[in-house]
């Protein structure tokens, strides 16, 4: 799993926190950030440079003119797919954690209200 990331020398893809991608001249610059360890101020990161792929395509639908376009490298596209899987998994785990905490807080308030209601009923019984 994550063969493209491992081919870049990333031995522990599960430690990836996020990534950024930018274009610089005729290159795409991929920067991968790893989770910070306790006591670290900055996250560890690695940077990769991919040359943009050049293609010649028909400039208009008639076929009389051609123009050169640049697009992302296919290898980089595969790496980004793997990074998206990792980062999306982290986001869904975070969303699940948030949902569980919200459910727990709601349950706390329901139980607190029920306890108050039962205590009020007990007070009514002891007054008689």
From Swiss-Prot:
Pfam families in the record: DUF3461
Lineage, highest ranks first: Bacteria, Pseudomonadati, Pseudomonadota, Gammaproteobacteria, Enterobacterales
Protein family membership: Belongs to the UPF0325 family.
Protein name per its UniProtKB record: UPF0325 protein YaeH
InterPro entries tied to this protein: UPF0325 (IPR020911)
Signal sequence coordinates: none
Species whose genome carries this gene: Salmonella typhimurium (strain LT2 / SGSC1412 / ATCC 700720)
Disulphides: none
